[in-house]
């Protein structure tokens, strides 16, 4: 789950954009010669910004962050692919559901977390840009 800036063009979608390491050795970029990267999303709430449920079909470094930034909708608070926001000291991204098979009992385990209260505030409040010197 993530809060992205602005309103997405569609209530659900699939971002299929290959990623590779940028020349700076830190950032990832969308590039035709990159590794396959596919992200599905579904809008959960939309106001000034958008709360999205995200499903990764691949697992590339920074995949969610780069894919939404490439659409022009970076994650709120993302200092690498968007801009810092004084309201949140990290990017607005949280795993809300985790499924796995217990290796001992072989039972399917599901753990879920609620939407952080801060995420709902980020939907409507104006961004507070951190001053730079």
Language model features with spans:
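RNA pseudouridine synthases
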Residues: 1-133
């Amino acid at each position: 789950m993530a809060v992205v800036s602005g309103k997405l063009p569609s209530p659900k979608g699939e971002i299929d954009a290959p990623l590779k390491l940028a020349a700076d050795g830190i950032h990832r970029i969308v590039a035709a010669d990159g590794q396959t990267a596919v992200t599905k999303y579904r809008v959960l709430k939309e106001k000034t910004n958008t709360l999205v449920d995200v499903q990764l079909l691949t697992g590339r470094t920074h995949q969610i962050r780069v894919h939404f930034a490439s659409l022009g909708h970076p994650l709120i608070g993302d200092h690498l692919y968007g801009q810092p926001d004084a309201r949140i000291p990290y990017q607005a991204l949280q795993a809300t559901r985790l499924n796995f098979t217990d290796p001992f009992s072989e039972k399917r385990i599901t753990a879920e977390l609620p939407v952080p209260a801060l995420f709902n505030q980020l939907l409507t409040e104006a961004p507070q840009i951190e001053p730079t010197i």
